[in-house]
Amino acid sequence: MNPLTQVKRTQVINQKEALLGIGEDGSWHAKFKDSAYVFVGGIPYDLTEGDLLAVFAQYGEVVDVNLVRDKGTGKSKGFAFLAYEDQRSTILAVDNLNGAKVLGRIVRVDHVSKYKKKEEEDEEELQKKREARGVCYAFQKGECNRGASCRYSHDEQRNANTGWGSKEESKARWEHDRHHEPPMSHKKFPSSAGEQRFPDRAKEENKSTGREGQSSRSEAYKDRDSRLRHSDRGSKDHDRYRHDRSPERSRGDRQRNNDRYAQGRDEKSERYRSEVKHDEGDQKRSRRDTDSSGHYERRGNEDSERYRKSRR
């Protein structure tokens, strides 16, 4: 919950209790009758323990002030815990100072039910505990920014002689995470034929001139020649690929594809027109044939009738 919202809610509860005339036994303060500590939040960072004493001493005698500070920098974190000699002074402090402005900031004051005072530990004991926990690996790398609040040892001599890499190696789950050799991403491979390593010819000449020595030298030179040919072929393929992927070539390919598509579309439309004309010619020819056949049939009928009449 927002601290300002908590301040307003506490003020509303106090106003309602005052209007209703609720006594101490029925008040919400009665839940904290066993604690003489109050929490103070929203403190300006410039305030010190003496300033807090001057502000809160007007409602009772303050016996303990714990202004929480950062262990590394020593700067205030903006909140504190105060203890009164009389527990009833906490009620006055909460009712009157909750929501008050101190150096332009609204201060929140509330009861603390169970406050456990942190025991001050000796610096030697803290150092022993840090040594028992182990070495700060972030400090070894120069990345630890916790300062004195770090729970691990910052002893430079011990950090230099720990050999923490072996510990990391023992905890590594996968084989490639172990520190036997640099990772593959850190290795340098030859990028051209000139950077490749080949057997030294002088060393090969120093070998015995026997049959085995001659065969080993010839095999080494054969391997070198094959690797050179392979690297030359790879460079040529790379250049050809770059030429194929050039913008001018891709633009020309697109233009040729567009021309080929337009030519195919024109041929298809021309073929369609010729088929339509052919179908129309077939329909006219079939219509003419049917008309002529009917005409010849009628003429044959007339001739047969005329022949019958003449025979009668």
Curated annotation (Swiss-Prot):
Pfam families: RRM_1, zf-CCCH. This is Zinc finger CCCH domain-containing protein 25. GO terms for molecular function: DNA binding; RNA binding; zinc ion binding. It comes from Oryza sativa subsp. japonica. A zinc finger (C3H1-type) spans 130-157. InterPro entries: Nucleotide-bd_a/b_plait_sf (IPR012677), RBD_domain_sf (IPR035979), RNA_proc/Spliceosome_comp (IPR051847), RRM_dom (IPR000504), RRM_Ist3-like (IPR045844), Znf_CCCH (IPR000571). Keywords: DNA-binding, Metal-binding, RNA-binding, Zinc, Zinc-finger. The keyword Transcription does not apply.
